[in-house]
Amino acid sequence: MKDGSAPFNADVVTYNTLMKVWGRAAQTLAEGRGRGDVNEVIHAMDDVPEELNHGGVYTAKDAADRALTILNTVEKNYLTGASDIAPNTFGYNIVLDGIAKCHAKDAPEQVEKIFNRMKRVSVEGVPHPDEDEEYLNGDVSKWAAVRPDAISYSIVMETIGQSREYGIMSKVENLLEDIEAEYEKTNDPELKPVTRVANSAINAFLKNSGSIKGHKASSNKAWLSAKKVHEIVNTCNRKWKETGDASYQPDITTITMAIDSYSRCNDIAATERGEFLFEKVYKDWKKTGDSKLKPSSRSFTVVSFCDSNYHT
């Protein structure tokens, strides 16, 4: 080109990058770090369609919604044949993560809705609302690339954990069982329920745990959560020992969260279990030198809090 410029042809990476910018903006705004240079970054991209970058962004939810708008545009244009750019799981995960990190009240519901759509269209395709018509790219063969992966499951479990609605924990259990069944059926490495996935489930339980001293119902809830967390830890250990696959091995994050779950029970028996877990992981770290088992400052803080319940 005489002016040194080159033609710009957007592809799926372009749109995923745009969504990632807005997802990061959602996290930044949610953490109270202000607007930053988000608008400058977006508006500096002159080749980006105007409908994807105009308007003000003032809250974390605004930014997350902007990422979702881009995804919806890519999806609609591909369905109708206006574009040959097909959305993929990576792009959906970016949007899921942005919504999760904006911590809006409806984030769990919104994330679950998108996740369920991913599952549905990846096995059924996208039927036209008018039964007598078809989308140009609505066939299931065109949508296999949006099937949820292990990252999708992890994001959804952690986001559902933000909700205070009744029955939320059963949803997390169902998701964990679902990904394990899908992996067993397909042996797809993208669906492997590794330690990171287990940690996401545990974190969801922790967000819905907690006990108020003298309040029997909350104490029972904390105990149930701690019991479920310990079951997940045991499952990880069993898989690791049976397969020798280190990707299943509980790490210090796993154990620290398990200790934390017991510390929330405000019960001497729970304190003893938490201390046992800490002593075991500490000995294992000293014996093996495995950096994944090295207690962190958070580990010491949690076990100290757990121990304080024993003496109060």
Segments (PLM) and residue ranges:
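Intrinsically disordered terminal tails
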Residues: 253, 279, 298-305, 309-312
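Short coil/turn connectors between adjacent alpha-helices in alpha-solenoid helical repeat scaffolds
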Residues: 23-66, 99-111, 159-171, 206-228, ...
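Low-complexity/repetitive intrinsically disordered segments
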Residues: 1-12, 311-312
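Fungal C-terminal region signature
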Residues: 221, 263, 273, 290, ...
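Hydrophobic packing position at a conserved site in alpha-helical tandem repeat units
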Residues: 1-4, 22, 45-48, 52, ...
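Pentatricopeptide repeat
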Residues: 11-16, 20, 88-93, 97, ...
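Helix-start/N-cap signature of alpha-helical segments
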Residues: 7, 11, 60-63, 84, ...
